[in-house]
Amino acid sequence: MERLSEDDPAAQALEYRHDASSVQHPAYEEGQTCLNCLLYTDASAQDWGPCSVFPGKLVSANGWCTAWVAR
């Protein structure tokens, strides 16, 4: 499966970033990452894993987007 690019239109629409520590968004709270998001569908995937928001793409476990939901 292909990794999601930050330049992908869907990624840009949800302000996805590979590295949550670089996020400058008012909704972001420290500690939120794809790995601890409910939408990250394989919590055992510690580097890159699937996300239900971006079908067919892998997101960084350390990433973040505006669709983040607590696991």
Curated annotation (Swiss-Prot):
GO terms for molecular function: 4 iron, 4 sulfur cluster binding; electron transfer activity; metal ion binding. The keyword Zinc does not apply. SUPFAM superfamilies: HIPIP (high potential iron protein). [4Fe-4S] cluster binds at C34, C37, C51, C65. GO terms for biological process: aerobic electron transport chain. Gene3D superfamilies: High potential iron-sulphur protein. It holds the Pfam family HIPIP. Keywords: 4Fe-4S, Electron transport, Iron, Iron-sulfur, Metal-binding, Transport. Belongs to the high-potential iron-sulfur protein (HiPIP) family. Specific class of high-redox-potential 4Fe-4S ferredoxins. Functions in anaerobic electron transport in most purple and in some other photosynthetic bacteria and in at least one genus (Paracoccus) of halophilic, denitrifying bacteria. Homodimer. This is High-potential iron-sulfur protein isozyme 2.
